[in-house]
Amino acid sequence: MRQNNNITEFVLLGFSQYPDVQNALFVMFLLIYIVTMVGNLLIVVSIIASPFLGSPVYFFLACLSFIDAVYSTTISPVLIVDLLCDKKTISFPACMGQLFIEHLFGDTDVFLLVVMAYDRYVATCKPLRYLTIMNRQVCILLLVVAVTGGFLHSVFQILVVYSLPFCGPNVIYHFFCNIYPLLDLECTDTYFVGLAVVFNGGAICMVIFTLLLISYGVILNSLKTYSPEGRHKAPFICSSHFIMVILFFVPCIFLYVRPVSNFPIDKFLTVFYSVITPKLNPFIYMLRNSEMRNAIENLLGYQSGKTGFRCSKLN
């Protein structure tokens, strides 16, 4: 339950107080946001519209792209608008809402990457039973589990912040409401709360990252035992997923696998995994996947010159 406090709004410092720098950042982040939304929604629509992309991996890819689009919308529009404002403020309820939604979709993204790694494991190690194991009901169940995991983690984060008192100051040294900058403003000792946040966020992030690396190692090792062609494809077969895992988890590990503290570089690392990575997602999958490229070309009205059914796989 929230304790009494005299804070009704927070002031976000953002990146810079210089107008010229703010204008340049406004243009840059606006373009990034537009590209992010167009790219991710293009993947979602292409997968829904294409009769050839019915494999479970594309179902999860569409979900990942949709979540990335929503996740980016949680942060980028506020950042873009604030760059045009002299006083960057956010109300207490809006700040709590942003914190909850950001963690909800960010954590769902993390769990969905685990689900996609499992999907690739089944497709590679049990190809004859792939469609039987990864049937429609299982895919929906795995998606629900990913969303539930993100929801529970977000509830914990919001309860931690909401239950502690804010007495001032109300200046957040960040461009949005994030957990560590908010804990710095609490009027009580947050040492043990910080340890709980590290365990809940950082440790889980590290464990999942390690499990993902192990799973990709198992997949690559399994591919090498198949045939000369399998050995040739081994370095590339799951590269799209692996690249996304590295881009997302490395900044998160640096930010959350440590005691509660804030550094100037935190803002730039947060931009990388919350603004840049969702933009890169569609390009990585389009460049690494010929089926995805063909589906987008067909959606946009281009003739790919190829017909017929193609086995669904990422390469």
Swiss-Prot record:
Glycans are attached at residue 6. Residues 46-57, 117-139, 215-235, 288-315 are cytoplasmic. Residues 1-24, 81-95, 161-193, 257-266 are extracellular. One of its GO terms (cellular component) is plasma membrane. This is Olfactory receptor 4A8. The keyword Cell membrane applies. It is a multi-pass membrane protein. The chain crosses the membrane at residues 25-45, 58-80, 96-116, 140-160, 194-214, 236-256, 267-287. GO terms for molecular function: G protein-coupled receptor activity; olfactory receptor activity. Its main location: membrane. InterPro entries: GPCR_Rhodpsn, GPCR_Rhodpsn_7TM, Olfact_rcpt, Olfactory_Receptors. Keywords: Cell membrane, Disulfide bond, G-protein coupled receptor, Glycoprotein, Membrane, Olfaction, Receptor, Sensory transduction, Transducer, Transmembrane, Transmembrane helix. The lineage of its organism: Eukaryota, Metazoa, Chordata, Craniata, Vertebrata. Disulfide bonds join 95-177. Belongs to the G-protein coupled receptor 1 family. Odorant receptor. It holds the Pfam family 7tm_4. It comes from Homo sapiens (Human). It is found in: Cell membrane. It comes from the Eukaryota.
